[in-house]
Amino acid sequence: MASLIYRQLLANSYAVDLSDEIQSVGSEKNQRVTVDPGPFAQTGYAPVNRGPGEVNDSTVVQPVLDGPYQPAPFDLPVGNRMLLAPTGPGVVVEGTDNSGRWLSVILIEPGVTSETRTYTMFGSSKQVLVSNVSDTKWKLFEMMKTAVDGDYAEWGTLLSDIKIYGMMKYGERLFIYEGETPNARTKGYIVTNYTSVEVRPYSDFYIISRSQESACTEYINNGLPPIQNTRNVVPLAISSRSIKPRKVQPNEDIVVSKTSLWKELQYNRDIIIRFRFDNSIIKAGGLGYKWAEISFKAANYQYNYISDGEEVTAHTTCSVNGVNDFSFNGGSLPTDFAISRYEVIKENSYVYVHYWDDSQAFRNMVYVRSLAANLNDVMCSGGDYSFALLVGQWPVMKGGAVTLHTAGVTLSTQFTDFVSLNSLRFRFRLSVEEPSFTITRTRVSKLYGLPAANPNGGREYYEVAGRFSLISLVPSNDDYQTPIMNSVTVRQDLERRLNELREEFNNLSQEIAVSQLIDLAILPLDMFSMFSGIEGTVNAAKSMATNVIRKFKSSKLASSVSMLTDSLSDAASSISRSTSIRSIGSTASAWTNISKQTQDAVNEVATISSQLSQISGKLRLKEITTQTEGMSFDDISAAVLKANIDRSIQVDKNALPDVITEASEKFIRNRAYRVIDGDEAFEASTDGRFFAYKVETLEEMPFDIEKFADLVTRSPVISAIIDFKTLKNLNDNYGITREQAFNLLRSNPKVLRGFMDQNNPIIKNRIEQLIMQCRL
C-alpha cells in the first residue's frame, strides 16, 4: 500500500537521532579547530554600550593638572611649571644650564638638629650640613653652585606641611617657591641659557600651565586635589607626552586579530541617518464631520550621501512604540466634529530606526561583537493638519515637538520580498519640547508630544549624524564571503519556493484521474520509488532520505506515534458510562413533544460527540501501526503526493522534506474511521459525527459508546473511504450485496477499482471529494 512511505518514515526516525548526533559531534570538533568560541561565539544581539550620544558644546575643556609622571630626565617646556611630590627625605630634583647654574633641591624631615649628611648631586657625593628646627613642617632648600668645580651654597628655603615643590622656566629666569606654607610665594633666578635647562626629578611630578598660577600656588600651600591622592592614580612615563595624536578617519577598517582562517576586523563608520514618519488618517462614515483614526505607521526612506569621499546608498525604516491614544468628541450630533482616536508620542514612547547601507561593514555583519554607537540628538516638530469639514471653519491640529535621544543600538534584519539585509536598529527615547500642540476651534490646547497628524512638519526627512563601531569576524581571505550561521535569506527563498509549490500541487490535485489514483494507492511505495520522479535524486537518494526523515521526525504525526497507546487508553477511560443512544440522524427522528426529553437527548449527543472526537483524532495512528488489507486515507494521500511529485516541475531536494511533512499533516483533514464487530459497524469522524449500523441491512442502531471504546483498543481500525452516508446512498440507488457491503466497509481496493471501472458516479464522486481535500 502507498501508505508504506509514512510507516517507513516513522520506523526510521531513530536513524535521524544518530545522524544528528554524528553531525553535531563533527560540527563541534570543527569549531574547536577553526574558530575559538568566546568573543567569536556571539552571533545574536551584540553587546551594547549605551550612552547619551554626542553632546554639541563649543567650550574647550582643558585639564589643570597633567600627570602624574614617573621620575625621568625631562626638558621642561618654557612657560610650564613642574610640581614635584616627594614621599621621603633626600634629593628631590636637579637642574642645570651646563654653564653658570647647578641647582639641587633637598628635602629634610621635621625636627632635625644640625648634622652632616651625604647626598649624591650631579653624580658626585657631597657632604651637606642640614637642620630643620620646625617640628611639624618639612624643609625644602636649594643648594646651588655657579661653577663645575665650585662649592654648593644654600639659597632659598621652603617650609611645607605637604611636601609639594614647584619650578618653572620663563622670561630668562628659573622660578621656584620660597617662604612658609600657607603663604609661600614665587621667586626667580636669572639663568643665562634658561631655555636649555634640563631637570632631573627624583619623585613623581605634575605639569601645570603658567596660566594656572593661582591654582598652582593653591596646590603648593594646601595640597593637591583629593583625586590625586588615591591609589587609583598611576604615574605614567614622561615619554607618553610625545605620542603624536592620530587623526581619526571617517571610515576605518582595522585588523584587530588574525589567524590562518579568520580575522577580526573593526569597522568604524561615520553615518548620516535620514528618516521620516508616516501616518494613516481614516475618516469615519457619515456626513464628513468625524474621523475614525489618526495613527503612526512604519515609513521607509532611501537616500544617498557622501562618506569619506565615497557615495553611500542608505535605507532606513522608522517605526514607533508606546504611543498614547487621545480622542476628541465635540458632541453627539452627526454634524459635531469628533476624532475617535489619534496617536501621540511622548516621554514614555520610543522611536526605532533601522539603518542599512551598501558599505562593506554591512556585508560582514554576521559574527559581531563590541557594537557601539554615538548619535546626535534631533528635534522633531509637527506641522499643521486641517480637518476639512463640509460646512463651517475647519479645525486645525498644529504644533507639538519631541527630541530624540539615542538609547541603544542592536543588530537586526530588514526583510524584503527577495532578500534579508543585516541592519542596525537604533532606539531613541523621547523628551517633549515646546511648542505644545492644539486643535483650533476646540478646547484641546496645551498638550505636549508629537501627534500623528503631521509628524514631519512639511520636511522631507529628519537627519541625525553619528558614528558606530563594531568588530566582525570575517574570513582571512578577502575573496571568501562570510558564512551565515542562521541563513534567513536561504529560508526565505525556500519559503517562496514552497508557496509556489503549494499552489502548483493544489492545481495538479484537481487533474488527477481517479483510476490512476487507485492504481497508485495500492502500490507499495517506498522511499526510492517515491523520489524516483525527481531529476537528479538517484545519485543522492541516501542524503535525500535522511533529509526527509529528519524533517518528518518533527511532524505532528511522528511525535504522536510514541504516545499512541497512552493516548488511546486515556481517551477511552474518559468515556462516560452512559446509556446507548442513537446516532445524530436517528435522534432527530425520535423527536417527541416533551421539550425536556428533547433537550436531554441533544445534550447527550453533544457530549458523546465531544468524547468521540478525542478518540477519532488518534484512530489514524492506530490504523498506521496495525496495517490491514484495506485501502486507507494515507494510501490516497501518498498516491496524490506521488502523482504530484511526478508531474511537478518545481520540486527540488530542498523543498521535498517540507512538502512530504506538510502533506502528512494537511491532506484529507476530514476523515472517518470504523471498527467492525461481526455484523455491527461503528463509525466515527474527526468532526464528531458517529454512526452505528448493521452491515447486512445498513439499518442504524443505538451507538454503544462503551463497546466502541473497547473495540478501538483491541480491534483493527479501518479508514472509512466509503463512509456510511455514501454506502447507504449506494445501496438505496443501486443495491449492493452483503459481500460487497463488507468489502466496501473494509475499503477493499479491488472492489473499489471494480466500481470505478463501472464508472459508478457515487463512488467516483466520493473519491474525487477526498482528492480535493489533498491540498497544501
UniProtKB/Swiss-Prot annotation:
List the Gene3D superfamilies hit by this protein, alphabetically. Answer: 1.20.5.170, 2.60.120.200
Q: Where does the record place the site Cleavage? A: 231-232, 241-242, 247-248
Return the annotated region ranges for Hydrophobic: 389-409
**Where do the record's region annotations for Spike foot lie?**
510-776
The UniProt entry annotates the motif DGE motif at 308-310
Residue interval(s) of motif YGL motif: 448-450
Q: Extract the Pfam families matched here.
A: Rota_VP4_MID (PF17477), VP4_haemagglut (PF00426), VP4_helical (PF17478)
- UniProt keyword terms in alphabetical order: Capsid protein, Coiled coil, Disulfide bond, Hemagglutinin, Host cell membrane, Host cytoplasm, Host cytoskeleton, Host endoplasmic reticulum, Host membrane, Host-virus interaction, Membrane, Outer capsid protein, Viral attachment to host cell, Viral penetration into host cytoplasm, Viral penetration via permeabilization of host membrane, Virion, Virus entry into host cell
Coiled-coil regions listed in the entry: 484-518
The record's similarity note reads:
Belongs to the rotavirus VP4 family.
Name under which the protein is recorded:
Outer capsid protein VP4
Organism, per UniProt? Rotavirus A (strain RVA/Cow/United States/B641/XXXX/G6P7[5])
Q: What is the lineage of its organism?
A: Viruses, Riboviria, Orthornavirae, Duplornaviricota, Resentoviricetes
